[in-house]
């Protein structure tokens, strides 16, 4: 069940903003692969999930299931800023789009960058966890490169709720200071207190800011599908965490062993580090892992934990094209906890750009080749 008529790749889409890749590179047909691999693809909108009846209701009718996999990604949590003020939320979404969900926001953001003639662009970063943690910094770099190339008198102010740039902190810091010292300003500990989109003002714990234009990234949460299924976790204070409450290695919901949640909607999986990175690489790995789990269950075989890895490349310079990267590896300790090992590749290089394209094409060929 897929809402969108085509596949649009959020990974690599920052490069599309400055024409390093074209639309054909990001857009892929999904019906051809469905025919090739022998599964049914229905383009529809999910309207409700009834776990007691094992039924998913859609705009085209109801479907019963034995196993359910929820892979809906994220949703924007504008209510963290505006409460129930839908006017402010809708105004922000329309005028200061973030383009972290595949939709028309990407085109709106590209137009915003191309039409900008000068002034200050503020970019708010969501608090962790959020989709693709290093990508806002990459976006700032490629925007800065575009403005520098076209001699546009622009300033980019990154309001970061974290105390430090992460991940790939040194690599991004060097890019900011060496390539774009007069364009990019990174403000740490800038947790949002108040957003006034109508008057273009933001209050943070690091000070107050005004802007000519902005990319206002609200906090992220699990997709609507997880909320429909009533599988959102709770804090010790009994407040919603915003993310699915799942078994850390088996990946099914703690409340329902026949419902799996994969990709960016997943909640924390280890007290040692919290969440898996919400990346396309991890999401793809989780799809493969859960497919194996269900196959083993159907065959009445033992299901043993399988852990993913993660790999992200980030473009920081458009000419010459240079990237940095980060790798994550995971292992299961004897006490049953998942352990994370992070390796930042801070030295920007053209080789990493080539590796990025090899990675992306490999992933597309893995599940989108017809």
Model-derived segments and their meaning:
Residues 1-40, 127-168:
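Beta1-alpha1 glycine-rich phosphate/pyrophosphate-binding loop at the start
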Residues 164, 305-324:
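Flavin (FAD/FMN) cofactor-binding core of flavoprotein oxidoreductases
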Residues 41-138, 145-149:
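FAD-binding core/adjacent interface of flavoenzyme oxidoreductases
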Residues 36-49, 55-56, 63, 145-242, ...:
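A Rossmann-like FAD-binding core segment of flavoenzymes
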Residues 86-115, 210-213, 217-283:
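FAD-site-proximal beta/loop scaffold in flavoenzymes
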Residues 323-370:
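C-terminal auxiliary extensions adjacent to catalytic cores
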Residues 262-308, 314-315:
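A conserved FAD-binding loop/helix module that cradles the flavin
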Residues 120, 153-157, 258:
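Residues at the starts of beta-strands that form the adenosine-phosphate
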């Amino acid at each position: 069940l897929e809402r969108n008529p085509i596949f649009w790749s959020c990974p690599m889409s920052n490069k599309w903003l400055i024409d390093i890749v074209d639309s054909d590179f990001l857009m892929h047909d999904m019906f051809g692969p469905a025919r090739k691999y022998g599964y049914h693809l229905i383009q529809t909108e999910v309207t409700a999930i009834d776990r007691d009846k094992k039924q998913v209701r859609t705009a085209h009718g109801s479907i019963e299931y034995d196993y359910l996999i929820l892979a809906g990604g994220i949703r924007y949590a504008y209510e963290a800023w505006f409460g129930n003020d839908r006017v402010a939320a809708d105004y922000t979404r329309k005028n200061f789009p973030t383009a972290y969900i595949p939709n028309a926001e990407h085109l709106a953001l590209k137009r915003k960058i191309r039409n900008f003639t000068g002034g200050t662009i503020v970019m708010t970063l969501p608090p962790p966890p959020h989709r693709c943690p290093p990508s806002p910094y990459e976006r700032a770099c490629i925007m800065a490169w575009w403005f520098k190339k076209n001699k546009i008198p622009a300033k980019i102010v990154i309001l970061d709720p974290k105390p430090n740039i992460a991940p790939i902190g040194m690599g991004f810091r060097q890019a900011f200071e060496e390539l774009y010292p007069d364009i990019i300003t990174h403000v740490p500990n800038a947790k949002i207190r108040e957003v006034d989109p109508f008057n273009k003002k933001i209050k943070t714990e690091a000070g107050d800011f005004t802007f000519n234009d902005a990319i206002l990234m609200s906090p992220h949460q699990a997709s609507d599908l997880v909320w429909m299924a009533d599988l959102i976790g709770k804090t010790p204070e009994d407040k919603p965490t915003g993310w699915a409450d799942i078994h850390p290695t088996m990946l099914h919901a703690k409340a329902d062993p026949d419902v799996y949640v994969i990709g960016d909607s997943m909640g924390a999986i280890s007290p040692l580090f919290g969440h898996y990175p919400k990346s396309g690489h991890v999401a793809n790995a989780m799809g493969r892992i859960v497919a194996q789990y269900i196959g083993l269950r159907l065959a009445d075989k033992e299901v043993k934990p399988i852990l993913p890895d993660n790999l992200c490349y980030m473009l920081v310079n458009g000419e010459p094209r240079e990237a940095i990267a980060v790798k994550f590896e995971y292992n299961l300790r004897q006490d049953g906890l998942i352990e994370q090992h992070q390796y930042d590749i801070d030295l920007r290089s053209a080789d990493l750009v080539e590796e990025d394209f090899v990675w992306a094409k490999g992933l597309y060929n893995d599940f989108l080749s017809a």
